[in-house]
Amino acid sequence: MDANGGPVQIRTQNYVKLGYHYLITHFFKLMFLPLMAVLFMNVSLLSLNHLQLYYNSTGFIFVITLAIVGSIVFFMSRPRSIYLLDYSCYLPPSSQKVSYQKFMNNSSLIQDFSETSLEFQRKILIRSGLGEETYLPDSIHSIPPRPTMAAAREEAEQVIFGALDNLFENTKINPREIGVLVVNCSLFNPTPSLSAMIVNKYKLRGNIKSFNLGGMGCSAGVIAVDLASDMLQIHRNTFALVVSTENITQNWYFGNKKAMLIPNCLFRVGGSAVLLSNKPLDRKRSKYKLVHTVRTHKGSDENAFNCVYQEQDECLKTGVSLSKDLMAIAGEALKTNITSLGPLVLPISEQILFFATFVAKRLFNDKKKKPYIPDFKLALDHFCIHAGGRAVIDELEKSLKLSPKHVEASRMTLHRFGNTSSSSIWYELAYTEAKGRMRKGNRVWQIAFGSGFKCNSAVWVALRNVEPSVNNPWEHCIHRYPVKIDL
C-alpha cells in the first residue's frame, strides 16, 4: 500500500458502490415485508361484522370482477416469449483458408493493384487483428479471380446450405414446420432472392412469411432477429428461421483507392442460421430466451449516412468505401443505443447515477465533466461485439469500460474467422459456449454496427447451462484459444 492509501481507497470506493447497488436494487423487496406486516396488523384489528359487511357490498363484487377481467386482458395482451432453440455457424473447408502470405501473393499476381496499394493492404492486414486461418471463397483464390454471378451463387449456397443442414440435423425440425423466414445479405441480392433459394432447396411450405433484407450492413443480423420476433408475436405456434451472411465473390475491390481497399483486408467467408420459436413447450429444449432488441438509426445525418458507402472509383471499379469518421460516428450511434437499452437492463442504482450526473452536468453547465457511463457489467454477463475490426472492439472496450475477458470472444472471432459481417455475433456466442462459460440465467448482449449508419442490440438470457452444439465452428480449435495477438 502506498503512503496515500491509494489501493485501499479504490477498494473502499468499489465496496461502497457495490453496497449502494444492492441497496437500491433490492429497496422495494426490503420494504415489502414491513408494509405487509403493517397491512396484516390493520386487517386483524377489524371485527367480524366489518369484514362481513365489506364482503357483501356491491363495491367488493365490482373490485373482484375488475381484477378478474384485468388479469384476463393482461395475460392475453402480454408479448409472447421468443425462444432460441439452436443456431449454427458455417465452417468453410480448409482449402479456402488464406494466410497473410497467400493473400499478398494472390493480390500481387492479380496485377490490378499498384505497389502503393499492395503495401497499404499489407499494413492493414498486419494491424487488423485477423489470424492466418480466415477464409475466402474459391472465386477469390482463383488466378485470375472469378467474380461471376455463378460463382457468387455458389458461394451463397455453400454458406447458407451448410449452416442450415447442420441446424436441421441438430434440432430435428422438419423444414415444412417453419412459418417465418428472414434472410439478410447486404451486397448480394440476386433474382430469385436468397430467401426464395432456401424455400426451393428445403421445400418450405407455400404460405411461409418470407423476407429478404439487403443493403443493411453488418448490423442486419439483429434487425433480422427483431423482424422475426415481431412476426412471431402475430403468428401463433410456429418457428422462425433467421439466416445471416455476406457474399464476397462480386464485392472484392480491384482498384487503388485506399478507403475502398480496407474491406478486402477485413471481410471473410461466414454465415449463420438461427431457429426461433414462440411455442411455450419449446422453452424446455431451448438455449436462450430473447429479452430485448433495440435499434438505432443515424441515417438522417449526412456524415453517418455516407461513412460506409458502396460506390465506383474514378476507374469505375466498384467497392465499399469506409470513411475516416467511421469510429466517431459509431461512438455516437453507440451512445444513442445504450441510452435506450440502459433503462431496460440496468439496475435502478445505475440508472439513478446516470440521471443524477446528467442533471448535474446540465444545471452547472460543466462541459468538461465527462458523462457517467453506466456499468453494464452489473446487468450483462457476456458481450458479443461485432467483430468489424480491431478498432471497433478497442473502442467499445474503452467506452463501456470492459475487461479483456469481456471482449475475448470478439477478438478471437476476428482472429479466427475475420469480419463475417452480420453473422460475427453468432460465432462469438459459439466461442463462449465452446469455452463452457454460459450458465443458466446468464445474460448476453449482442451489439452490431452497420451501414446507414445503424447500431443494434439484442439481449438474451440463458435458460440452462448451455453446451456447444454438434459441429460448433470452434470444436476443432477451441483448445488453442485465446491466443496472444500482437498489435
UniProtKB/Swiss-Prot annotation:
Protein name: 3-ketoacyl-CoA synthase 17
EC number(s) given by UniProt: 2.3.1.199
Transmembrane helix found in the keyword field: yes
GO BP, sorted A to Z: fatty acid biosynthetic process
Keywords: Acyltransferase, Membrane, NAD, NADP, Transferase, Transmembrane, Transmembrane helix
GO molecular function term, any single one: fatty acid elongase activity
Organism field: Arabidopsis thaliana (Mouse-ear cress)
Pathway as given in its UniProt record: Lipid metabolism; fatty acid biosynthesis
